[in-house]
Amino acid sequence: MVWVFKSQFEGLSALKRGVHALTKAVTPAFGPRGYNVVIKKGKAPIVLTKNGIRIAKEIILQDAFESLGVKLAKEALLKVVEQTGDGSTTALVVIDALFTQGLKGIAAGLDPQEIKAGILLSVEMVYQQLQRQAIELQSPKDVLHVAMVAANHDVTLGTVVATVISQADLKGVFSSKDSGISKTRGLGKRVKSGYLSPYFVTRPETMDVVWEEALVLILSHSLVSLSEELIRYLELISEQNTHPLVIIAEDFDQNVLRTLILNKLRNGLPVCAVKAPGSRELRQVVLEDLAILTGATLIGQESENCEIPVSLDVLGRVKQVMITKETFTFLEGGGDAEIIQARKQELCLAIAGSTSESECQELEERLAIFIGSIPQVQITADTDTEQRERQFQLESALRATKAAMKGGIVPGGGVAFLRAAHAIEVPANLSSGMTFGFETLLQAVRTPLKVLAQNCGRSSEEVIHTILSHENPRFGYNGMTDTFEDLVDAGICDPLIVTTSSLKCAVSVSCLLLTSSFFISSRTKT
């Protein structure tokens, strides 16, 4: 292993090349007329996608410093998607524009810290302008428009999202049993406790664990060590090639967690550790509820040192499992129907007889797990590749549409950014470096509209001129129909939260890059 060092401008130039290479790979898929990108990695199935984050994740460069630029940009995109479900490509084109122009300022002798200060001052004014443009969703039609844009203008997926988005506590759980796309209400059960380590995830693009079916081991005590019984138990699961295993316990010692992670990563053991849900006072009864729902035997009620029976009989079973950082959701449990019904009646009677508001709320939360309120969305397509892509689109659209319902919408197609930048004047009392940074941000936020117009075969400057010549703040270019019109009326709109989050992450990583002064990386000797 040898260490490689680069000075400020040399290193920044290499990082810029990496960011620009990533942008060139992602932007052809941007907008309603963007192209699909084909991804083939090793023996994995072929993926055809227009999703920016899925494309970006596959870009790896040989040069260590160019690769560092790619990695930093990817982290920003992942943060945008994690927060809102959309906006990754918008963030990337703004990063590329900010970094490229900012580097020109540094080359001209301007202070990077002053450039950063100008960018930060400018972006705060852009946020204020975006807030003024925000429109609250007023009708199901508004929700449908947002959902369709978030689903890459797929009418079917957008309609499904709009249909189920109003249901409380929504999270898609996916199946491929039936043809087409359909939803079924009231099947999903959810508890508010998720995986204890991101190393358990099976789908890095959405940072969750998804299995068609799984076994469940429920322990009422903390797992402080891997006893011989538990090791033999894990070996039994592996040898018999059964379903994946979810282990739910009061807590997990770090050494135990590390061992489970290593077994998953090195030996392919499909396992996930989940901390027992509920407050400390309620944890025991919530675990009993889960045991009833899944058909598991609750182990360790009497003593923390009790042995775990080396048998599959004590395991519960669940179907259509989705585990995120915060929740554990499943569609069907293997519990006895009569026992489940008896528990539901017991909880209903307890609620009716409770005189304590807090106790009543706790009982209602427990009852909600039994009743279930998570819609099942079933997706199939002609090929597995298409099915995976549509499933990913649907999940992203769900998150983005929920974001729109919280914060409202702004005109889409990059118009909100354009109008915001056009309404802002550069303050007169700034230094040359701050002025440069201020203007750089105002130009960078125009880039998403420019890229979209170019992907639709239009001159970006002509499109911008036409838009700004109209006073209607919602007037813009509709790439779907290749016309200029009121974008909100046409259903071309973006969630405000997605718009601001993409800009926030873009500014954050760009300022980090521009103010870096020395670069160190390693590479293997050849």
Curated annotation (Swiss-Prot):
State the EC number(s): 5.6.1.7
Molecular-function GO terms, alphabetical: ATP binding; ATP-dependent protein folding chaperone; isomerase activity
GO cellular-component term (any):
cytoplasm
What is the main EC category here? isomerase
Q: Which residues hold ATP?
A: 50, 413, 494
Per the similarity annotation, which family is this? Belongs to the chaperonin (HSP60) family.
What name does UniProt use for this protein? Chaperonin GroEL 2
Q: Which gene encodes it?
A: groEL2
